[in-house]
A protein has these predicted regions:
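Conserved phosphate- and dinucleotide-binding cores of soluble alpha/beta proteins
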Residues: 89-209
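N-terminal active-site beta-alpha-beta segment that forms phosphate/nucleotide-binding
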Residues: 2-87, 91-97
Length: 209
């Protein structure tokens, strides 16, 4: 994979790009970005939130945040009755951590959400957004990014989340099931209107779905 070309294509879209050879280097890079973002704030006053992400769990970034003393805000730690409010609060975080469902070789991020809170924070709200992306999520076109999400990402996430949708059997169909449907919102990010807001760390490992 030509990471140098991929990073150039991301940079031309007004987003910052970084390369990490493994999970450990990805976490180190993310912490360095956060350090540069916090200005004169104490770490304990820098709020960090995240969207649901297997990649973030795999790299260990949440544990690193706790060790470094950042004010981590986990909306998923709240009782189900309070999670909707908590997810709204995450939009006010200083830093939002996430991965992506797919990214094209030309640097376009492609994401599909069930509730929309994750893609909402990607687009607007938090001052900084840091993506950690494994090499398995790179596709050649938007069309193949969408295909990857429908055939790999959504089915695996549906099983992980215990959803009662057709894609749990590996056959993704355009279902319309309240509270269950995985593919309610589709977002393609082709440009960041605010320079310095979006930071993308590419990791030379397979991570997440």
């Amino acid at each position: 994979m030509n990471f140098e070309k991929l990073m150039r294509n991301v940079e031309k879209r007004n987003m910052s790009a970084y390369f990490a050879k493994d999970k450990e280097e990805a976490v180190k890079t993310a912490l360095e970005i956060m350090e540069s973002c916090r200005a004169h704030k104490e770490k304990s006053n820098v709020t960090v939130a995240w969207g649901g992400s297997v990649t973030l769990d795999e790299v260990g970034i949440k544990e690193a945040l706790a060790k470094e003393g950042y004010s981590a805000f986990n909306p998923y730690s709240y009782p189900p009755s309070e999670q909707a409010r908590a997810k709204k609060m995450a939009l006010l975080a200083d830093v939002f951590l996430t991965s992506t469902n797919a990214i094209t070789e030309d640097g376009e991020l492609v994401n599909i959400d069930g509730n929309g809170n994750r893609v909402a924070a990607m687009i607007y709200g938090p001052d900084k957004v840091i993506y950690i992306i494994g090499r398995n999520k790179v596709t050649d076109t938007v069309e193949n990014a969408y295909k990857r999400i429908k055939e790999i990402t959504c089915p695996k996430n549906a099983v992980r989340l215990g959803r009662k949708t057709p894609c749990t059997n590996g056959a993704c169909t355009p279902c319309l099931i309240p509270g269950q449907t995985m593919c309610s919102h589709t977002v393609i990010t082709r440009f960041s209107s605010v320079k310095g807001r979006v930071h993308i760390i590419f990791v030379d490992e397979e991570l997440g779905y």
